[in-house]
């Protein structure tokens, strides 16, 4: 009887695990304007042209851009979105966004939802208040955001996020994404040329990376007691802790219910956004943890890491916690690195 009972319990557990996996499979990437979403919302001919743009770097004709923008708007509104934003990465260390509603007036008291190709492809935020790395004078305000079709748009908090580059009127990079894409292009040209000389019939190479995000979690009430943490995100003074990271007993230790619940919510939010959140565990220092994704193309991995850091900090407040992403928030214990296994492949 005992053997039969154990077999039944094992089978039941496997079925429960399978059901959970199917649920994740069903909602993974549900908030991303993925290729499957494009197939549903775009005419077949336009979808094929979009694939050429994304995979081969071809230009997108204006008339096609209008169709893509309208389809993207319809998909986002079906997800409950009311606004869109050009999401970019200026030289501030964080992302930037300006939200515009889809509505356009058609009369004194009426509006229509509209989103056109020119609004998808280009935006004009005021660049005078963003750092330029000394490229130009501070009074020069002109700056442009340009759609990056290789990184998929997504919906978050009722807003359609469109990944974009940020540059000046003469093409000078005012962000972190533009140099990254240019370096990828330079590496692609050089590597393809070398491989062709060596006899390999290669037409394109891409770089991949999987940044491991380390972070600290501390109680929100304790966080509020420290002005230095509130202002700078790190401690500036204080005594050494009673116990540090001696014996490394925190590393890979069992997770508390509070932290586990936090990690589960983080996973769910990231999976909805198509982020391959894979591995999570306790790190060496007390209260330090790590979230590692499956590697993907460098450009997408960079965008997803920005999302990961944002989600880690926002979800922490739901559990009475504060997430510290500073590289060295505490003296005498490990800081938070960001290991990334960079490579390139054909």
At which residue positions do the language-model features occur?
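Glycine-rich, acidic/polar active-site loops that bind/position phosphate-bearing ligands
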Residues: 141-325, 330-346
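Flexible inter-domain linker/hinge segments
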Residues: 18, 23, 27-32, 185, ...
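Active-site core of metal-dependent hydrolases
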Residues: 10, 27-140
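Extracytoplasmic glycan-interaction modules
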Residues: 9-10, 203
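Extracytoplasmic/secretory-pathway proteins
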Residues: 13-14
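A short alpha-helix capping/helix-coil boundary motif
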Residues: 26-30, 49-53, 244-247, 289-293
């Amino acid at each position: 009887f005992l053997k039969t009972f154990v077999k039944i319990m094992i089978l039941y557990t496997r079925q429960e695990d399978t059901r959970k996996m199917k649920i994740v499979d069903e909602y993974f990437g549900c908030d991303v304007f993925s290729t499957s979403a494009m197939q549903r919302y775009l005419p077949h001919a336009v979808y094929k042209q979009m694939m050429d743009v994304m995979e081969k770097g071809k230009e997108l004709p204006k008339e096609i851009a209008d169709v893509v923008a309208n389809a993207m708007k319809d998909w986002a509104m079906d997800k409950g979105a009311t606004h869109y934003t050009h999401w970019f990465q200026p030289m501030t260390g964080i992302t930037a966004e300006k939200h515009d509603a889809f509505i356009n007036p058609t009369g004194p008291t009426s509006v229509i939802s509209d989103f056109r190709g020119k609004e998808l492809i280009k935006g004009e935020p005021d660049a005078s208040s963003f750092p330029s790395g000394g490229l130009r004078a501070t009074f020069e305000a002109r700056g442009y955001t340009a759609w990056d079709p290789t990184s998929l748009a997504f919906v978050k908090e009722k807003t359609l996020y469109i990944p974009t580059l940020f540059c000046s009127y003469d093409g000078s990079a005012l962000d972190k994404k533009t140099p990254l894409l240019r370096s990828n292009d330079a590496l692609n040209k050089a590597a393809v040329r070398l491989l062709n000389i060596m006899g390999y019939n290669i037409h394109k190479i891409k770089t991949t990376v999987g940044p491991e995000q380390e972070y600290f979690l501390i109680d929100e009430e304790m966080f509020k007691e420290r002005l230095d943490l509130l202002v700078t995100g790190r401690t500036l003074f204080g005594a050494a802790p009673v116990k540090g990271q001696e014996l490394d007993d925190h590393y890979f230790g069992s997770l508390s219910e509070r932290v586990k619940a936090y990690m589960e919510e983080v996973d769910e939010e990231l999976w909805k956004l198509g982020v391959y959140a894979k591995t999570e565990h306790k790190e060496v220092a007390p209260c330090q943890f790590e979230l590692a994704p499956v590697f993907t193309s460098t450009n997408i991995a960079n965008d997803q890491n920005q999302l990961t850091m944002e989600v880690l900090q926002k979800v922490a407040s739901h559990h009475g916690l504060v997430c510290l992403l500073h590289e060295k928030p505490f003296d005498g214990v490990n800081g938070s690195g960001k290991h990334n296994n960079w490579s390139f492949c054909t």
